[in-house]
From Swiss-Prot:
Organism from which the protein derives: Arabidopsis thaliana (Mouse-ear cress)
Cellular component GO terms held in the UniProt record: cytosol; EARP complex; GARP complex; recycling endosome
Full protein name: Vacuolar protein sorting-associated protein 51 homolog
Tissue specificity field: Expressed in primary and lateral roots, shoots of seedlings and flowers.
N-acetylalanine modification, residue list: A2
Stretch forming the signal peptide: none
Amino acid sequence: MATEAAPMDEKAKRMRDLLSSFYAPDPSISTSGSSINASFDNINSTSFDADQYMDLMIKKSNLEVLLQRHVQMAAEIKNLDTDLQMLVYENYNKFISATDTIKRMKSNIFGMEGNMDQLLQKIMSVQSKSDGVNTSLFEKREHIEKLHRTRNLLRKVQFIYDLPARLQKCIKSEAYGDAVRFYTGAMPILKVYGDTSFQDCRRASEEAIEIIIKNLQTKLFSDSESIQARAEAAVLLKQLDVPVDSLKAKLLEKLEQSLDGLQIKPEEASTLVEDDDSSNDTESNDQHPAKIHEDAVRGFSEAIRAYREIFPDSEERLFKLARALTAMHFEYMELYIKKRVSAADFLGIFRIVWEDVVLMDEVLPEAALSDLSAEAAQVTLKQFVARMFSHLQQDISDTLLKFDINQKEAVEGELLKVVLEASQKAVLQGTTNIFQDFRQLLDEKTGIFIKMKDLISGWIQKGSQDFFRSLEAQFLVLSGKTSSSNDIEGKSSDKIHAGLILVLAQLSVFIEQKVIPRVTEEIAASFSGGNSQAFENGPAFIPGELCRVFHAASEKLLQHYIDTRTQKVSVLLRKRFKTPNWVKHKEPREVHMYVDMFLHELEEVGKEVKQVLPQGTFRKHKRTDSNGSNTTTSSRSNTLHNDKMARSNSQRARSQLFETHLAKLFKQKVEIFTKVEFTQESVVTTTVKLCLKSLQEYVRLQTFNRSGFQQIQLDIQFLKAPLKEAVEDEAAIDFLLDEVIVAASERCLDVIPLEPPILDKLIQAKLAKSKEHNNNTVSS
């Protein structure tokens, strides 16, 4: 850049020197300053010596350098010629243009002097004629002005004589403002001539004014009159020099009492908003409550304006009244939003309140009502957002609890499916609707809403976070997993149906997978950003954390459902094993009734999970022995078939027990309790595992004789087939059933199992009896 700037500076310098040499009268003057310090090789100096320069160049340079210098000087000479030509042409064009301009100016000025002379003559002629007219009309003008003054005086005199009659007409028509204006206009004359020429007029006028003063005082203290009318009466009394300072306390007290009529009470707010909307569509809206309220507030503001002028020392009390009106407006708004209010109704009532604030602020700007209202509006808006989320949570809770979930309907019908679908719709549609209402808050054009846009977005994010956390806590309370201080909906945990717990678990999964992502999209699209002030008491919306919360809640609720169902079966088993004396048990003749009840409970679990949970991939797991060959899970049953018929019962029992324990050593390890998945098969399998584990523990607490042990053997053998059909992990079920038999044998005084033919006969008899019972039930 520096190498390019140097030639430009040299060229500009050369152009300046050319201009100076062209216009300077003496060329020596323009170059005298530079010739002092010029060297002998400066070709542009006046003291340049060509011969000396050439001698120096020949001595210092070779032929190649001389040729280059020759070419360079030829180019410079050519450039100088070109620049000089351009300079001459440009100045020549300017001279021609200036000449043309001078010619036009001369042509325009030509003839102007004659026109100016004619104009001067005409002006002198007009002036002389005007002087003549003034001289001729001077005497008549004085007479006309005298008559005009006389006429005005007569009109004033006539007005004074007509004043009593005018005042009486004003009294009849209650035009007290005109009466005061007439009387104050006539006062200067009445003061001067009231005791002489206009004595009667003055007396009659004063009598009329006394009546007017009484009427104005009556209006001033009348409760039926509007605030504005009373303020006008006070102004008129002050114009009549009536002392009103003594009335100040009563007037301000009445003004304070009028605040009650200006409040927007919660029971009237909805009607006020509806009438305000409908009044915009009608031509005559004088009778609408919104219009009436607007007129009342406007009258109140005008009264404050008048009282401020009448009583200058009462400003502080007027400020207090205006602030009280504003504060009461927002207090009633907070009461109004405690019930369910739509965003449109809330905005409607907020606009009315804000219009009142703006109107009062115009009258009393020193009261700083805008700042006070802005703080109150922040509190009200924040409460409204929180109330919206609270109402949504209540809707979801009502949807879950409005169905009377009893045992029969939950199992035989599809009530759980209906409850789940209704609650899912309530959550998804409810969140969609609430964010549509919140969008109206951001779209509102009222000034305070525009200023608080970031705050509103922050409150919505914070409210969403708190809503989902509160909803998760409520789910746990509704399920009986956690307790509540007020015992939700009057239901104790022992009366909560297990089906509701299952619905809550699946609903938590739905919220995690569907609702929270949609809410995240809504917030990102319309409510992003936010003010840090909105997050001062907690974090903003964190979808990842909420998903983890509901994922954990769904697992807790699903496990709670399994525990509830298992506990019911456990109670059944406890009654079964504590009732008889197992040491004196009789010989088994049939499968015990508790087995039917146990299977019935498992059937109910299966029907419930089919309504709520999806079906998983059904895989049955087989166990293998140490050699890898498939075996049945009950090694003890195999040994029964392989025993020799010649053995005695005692020897057979001891050998069978020994082989059972020996087979356990070679069995492959079976995982009994695995993670519960949200599938029908997983829930049923886990429930069966826990029930069998409870059965095993109850067996270990008893002591059996031979018949008692055989009864346990018969019951367990009957359970094998239906349980394997219901679960997906046959290996674990076989293992647990074997464990029950082993536990019974360990607690038996005389371990002699039933023969397989007898077992089969008793089981077949039970199956036939159950089939007959089912047929009779269907036919009936």
